[in-house]
Amino acid sequence: MTTITGLTVRDIRIPTSESLTGSDAMNPDPDYSAAYVELLTDHPAGLKGHGLAFTIGRGNELCAAAIEAWKPFILGQSLEEIRGDMRSFWRRMTRDSQLRWVGPEKGTVHMASAAIINA
């Protein structure tokens, strides 16, 4: 059985607004950003998972903070149990009684959950 032993998250930002790279009528000054998550395991081969939630700048720290908030729910989980019932894992994350007020299955909660699940 492979167990998740660590979770790190980084708030990565690329100053694309300086050159207006990726700008358009709706997004005049985007700074391409990502809340990047890495899951560590006890697998003998050093198995890791990587995922991200892509944003265009402001608010990226909210996704990173939401990922950090789920750390206690993730650490100690077995990959086999998660893969065996992804639906329950998704619901456990997006329907937490104290975190769901941030946006159940939408917005920050949805993006942060997706980053963890993709990792």
Give a label for each model feature:
Residues 1-57:
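Structured beta-strand/loop patches that form or line metal/cofactor-binding pockets in enzymes
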